Regions:
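Structural microenvironment flanking redox-active thiols in thiol-disulfide oxidoreductases
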Residues: 75-115
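Generic short beta-strand
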Residues: 145-146
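Short active-site neighborhood of thiol/selenol oxidoreductases, capturing the structured segment around
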Residues: 55-77
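Bacterial Sec-dependent N-terminal signal peptides
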Residues: 1-28
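Solvent-exposed loop/turn segments at secondary-structure junctions
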Residues: 13, 70-73, 111-114, 154-155
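Start-of-domain marker
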Residues: 19-61
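Thioredoxin-like thiol-disulfide oxidoreductase module
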Residues: 111-142
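Thiol-/selenol-based redox modules, centered on thioredoxin-like
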Residues: 151-155, 160-176
């Protein structure tokens, strides 16, 4: 009976810890939320991206930023090919624009290994003055991440590898 009770307690702790969306930075032993929600001045961000990053943005549409932090253990492994990656990004963009026509911007911090899988089919821009990293990511996002920003400046940032369907759900949540 005691063994069953202890197993039940252990199992419930595992379920609770697995359902909490957090990311652990092993180097500093800090825990960061995988998602952050907030509000920012959209016109300032648009201005920085337009002027420093030479990125065309329609301020009346949501802004979707796909972020590549540089090579890490997560994004340098796996079995995706250039072709499968291209198909994945195209489906993601189609789904985004089906929900709401949007500005979709691809931004990188460090291009190491970026153009091995992504070259030739997306226009990746360097993070101008590290504004995306400093504003949205307090630590290195493993694999990458995304930021969804409404025309009014409400945002959701996601720190880590993501599924395009989850991104679509968050975009619907943001614009509704």
């Amino acid at each position: 009976m005691i063994k069953k009770l202890l197993l039940l307690i252990l199992f419930s702790q595992i379920i609770i810890s697995c359902s909490t969306k957090k990311f652990s930075d092993e180097a500093t032993k800090k825990i960061y939320p995988v998602e952050r929600f907030g509000q920012l001045n959209r016109s300032v961000l648009d201005s920085v991206l337009k002027n420093s990053g030479n990125i065309s943005i329609d301020s009346n549409k949501p802004l979707v930023i796909i972020y590549y932090p540089g090579k890490d253990k997560c994004n340098s492994s796996g079995s995706s090919t250039r072709r499968s990656t291209k198909v994945w990004y195209n489906k993601m963009e189609k789904g985004i624009n089906k929900i709401e026509p949007s500005n979709i911007v691809y931004v990188y911090k460090d291009s190491t290994d970026l153009f091995e899988r992504h070259d030739g089919f997306k226009d990746w821009k360097r993070d101008p003055n590290k504004v995306i990293e400093k504003t949205f990511f307090k630590t290195h996002p493993p694999c990458g991440g995304y930021i969804l920003i409404s025309d009014s400046g409400r945002y959701i940032s996601h720190l880590a590898e993501f599924d395009k369907k989850f991104l679509w759900q968050r975009l619907e949540q943001l614009i509704n």
